Amino acid sequence: AGIYGPGRGPFAKVRKGTARRIIKQGQVFSRIHVEDIAQALELSLAKPQPGAIYNLCDDDPAPPQDVIGHAAALLGLPLPPAVNFDEAEMTPMARSFYAESKKVRNDRIKQALGWAPQFPTYRAGLAALLAQDS
Protein backbone atom coordinates (compact mmCIF):
# COMPACT_ATOMS: atom_id res chain seq x y z
CA ALA A 1 0.00 0.00 0.00
CA GLY A 2 1.13 3.55 -0.67
CA ILE A 3 2.11 5.36 2.52
CA TYR A 4 1.03 8.95 3.11
CA GLY A 5 1.12 11.32 6.04
CA PRO A 6 2.58 14.66 7.10
CA GLY A 7 4.95 15.87 4.39
CA ARG A 8 4.07 12.93 2.17
CA GLY A 9 0.93 13.22 0.09
CA PRO A 10 -0.62 14.98 -2.90
CA PHE A 11 -1.02 18.49 -1.47
CA ALA A 12 2.41 19.89 -2.39
CA LYS A 13 2.09 19.03 -6.09
CA VAL A 14 -1.49 20.28 -6.23
CA ARG A 15 -0.48 23.57 -4.60
CA LYS A 16 2.48 24.00 -6.97
CA GLY A 17 0.29 23.28 -9.99
CA THR A 18 2.41 20.30 -11.04
CA ALA A 19 -0.08 17.56 -10.15
CA ARG A 20 -1.63 15.52 -12.95
CA ARG A 21 -4.44 13.03 -12.85
CA ILE A 22 -2.93 10.01 -14.63
CA ILE A 23 -5.82 8.02 -16.08
CA LYS A 24 -5.37 4.28 -16.58
CA GLN A 25 -8.59 2.32 -16.95
CA GLY A 26 -9.21 -0.02 -14.00
CA GLN A 27 -6.16 1.21 -12.05
CA VAL A 28 -6.55 1.26 -8.25
CA PHE A 29 -4.08 1.49 -5.38
CA SER A 30 -4.40 0.71 -1.71
CA ARG A 31 -3.09 3.37 0.65
CA ILE A 32 -2.34 3.75 4.34
CA HIS A 33 -1.85 6.75 6.61
CA VAL A 34 1.39 6.62 8.59
CA GLU A 35 -0.55 6.94 11.88
CA ASP A 36 -2.46 3.76 11.00
CA ILE A 37 0.86 1.97 10.50
CA ALA A 38 2.02 3.10 13.94
CA GLN A 39 -1.24 1.91 15.51
CA ALA A 40 -0.91 -1.50 13.81
CA LEU A 41 2.68 -1.86 15.03
CA GLU A 42 1.63 -1.05 18.61
CA LEU A 43 -1.13 -3.67 18.44
CA SER A 44 1.19 -6.30 16.99
CA LEU A 45 3.66 -5.69 19.84
CA ALA A 46 0.87 -5.93 22.43
CA LYS A 47 -0.55 -9.12 20.87
CA PRO A 48 2.43 -10.87 19.28
CA GLN A 49 1.68 -13.61 16.79
CA PRO A 50 5.09 -14.88 15.66
CA GLY A 51 5.23 -15.52 11.93
CA ALA A 52 2.00 -13.66 11.18
CA ILE A 53 2.03 -11.45 8.10
CA TYR A 54 -0.45 -8.62 7.70
CA ASN A 55 -1.33 -6.30 4.86
CA LEU A 56 -1.74 -2.75 6.10
CA CYS A 57 -4.04 -0.56 4.06
CA ASP A 58 -7.18 1.49 4.39
CA ASP A 59 -10.61 0.19 3.42
CA ASP A 60 -10.90 2.07 0.12
CA PRO A 61 -8.53 1.22 -2.75
CA ALA A 62 -9.02 3.99 -5.29
CA PRO A 63 -7.75 5.28 -8.62
CA PRO A 64 -4.87 7.73 -8.21
CA GLN A 65 -6.72 10.42 -10.18
CA ASP A 66 -9.49 10.39 -7.56
CA VAL A 67 -6.99 11.11 -4.79
CA ILE A 68 -5.44 14.03 -6.69
CA GLY A 69 -8.89 15.40 -7.53
CA HIS A 70 -10.01 15.17 -3.91
CA ALA A 71 -6.85 16.93 -2.70
CA ALA A 72 -7.52 19.77 -5.14
CA ALA A 73 -11.14 20.01 -3.97
CA LEU A 74 -10.06 20.17 -0.31
CA LEU A 75 -7.65 22.98 -1.17
CA GLY A 76 -10.29 24.81 -3.21
CA LEU A 77 -8.06 24.64 -6.29
CA PRO A 78 -8.92 23.70 -9.87
CA LEU A 79 -8.93 20.05 -10.85
CA PRO A 80 -5.46 19.16 -12.18
CA PRO A 81 -5.35 18.11 -15.83
CA ALA A 82 -6.23 14.54 -16.78
CA VAL A 83 -3.55 12.75 -18.79
CA ASN A 84 -4.00 9.34 -20.37
CA PHE A 85 -1.41 6.89 -19.01
CA ASP A 86 -0.28 5.89 -22.51
CA GLU A 87 0.44 9.53 -23.39
CA ALA A 88 1.86 10.69 -20.05
CA GLU A 89 5.49 11.74 -19.90
CA MET A 90 7.01 9.82 -16.98
CA THR A 91 10.31 8.46 -15.82
CA PRO A 92 10.72 4.70 -16.25
CA MET A 93 10.40 4.35 -12.46
CA ALA A 94 7.11 6.29 -12.38
CA ARG A 95 5.80 4.30 -15.34
CA SER A 96 6.64 1.02 -13.58
CA PHE A 97 4.67 2.23 -10.54
CA TYR A 98 1.58 2.44 -12.74
CA ALA A 99 2.24 -0.90 -14.47
CA GLU A 100 -0.38 -2.72 -12.43
CA SER A 101 -2.96 -2.14 -9.73
CA LYS A 102 -1.70 -2.48 -6.18
CA LYS A 103 -4.74 -3.51 -4.20
CA VAL A 104 -4.55 -5.44 -0.93
CA ARG A 105 -6.97 -6.35 1.85
CA ASN A 106 -6.62 -5.80 5.58
CA ASP A 107 -9.05 -8.48 6.80
CA ARG A 108 -6.41 -10.60 8.55
CA ILE A 109 -5.09 -7.86 10.85
CA LYS A 110 -8.62 -6.73 11.65
CA GLN A 111 -9.60 -10.25 12.72
CA ALA A 112 -6.36 -11.21 14.47
CA LEU A 113 -5.60 -7.99 16.33
CA GLY A 114 -8.86 -6.05 16.28
CA TRP A 115 -7.17 -3.32 14.26
CA ALA A 116 -9.26 -0.72 12.46
CA PRO A 117 -7.71 2.14 10.53
CA GLN A 118 -8.20 5.56 12.09
CA PHE A 119 -8.35 6.81 8.50
CA PRO A 120 -10.44 4.17 6.67
CA THR A 121 -10.41 6.14 3.41
CA TYR A 122 -8.00 8.47 1.64
CA ARG A 123 -10.69 11.15 1.99
CA ALA A 124 -10.57 10.93 5.80
CA GLY A 125 -6.78 10.85 5.81
CA LEU A 126 -6.37 13.82 3.47
CA ALA A 127 -8.87 15.88 5.47
CA ALA A 128 -6.89 15.16 8.65
CA LEU A 129 -3.60 16.10 6.97
CA LEU A 130 -5.03 19.37 5.76
CA ALA A 131 -6.41 20.13 9.24
CA GLN A 132 -2.92 19.49 10.69
CA ASP A 133 -1.40 21.92 8.17
CA SER A 134 -3.79 24.69 9.25
Where are these regions (language model features)?
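Residue-level signal for the nucleotide or nucleotide-sugar donor/cofactor binding architecture
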Residues: 32, 62, 104, 117-120
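Conserved C-terminal active-site "lid" loop/helix of NAD(P)H-dependent oxidoreductases
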Residues: 69, 89-116
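Substrate-positioning beta->alpha
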Residues: 3-13, 21-45, 52
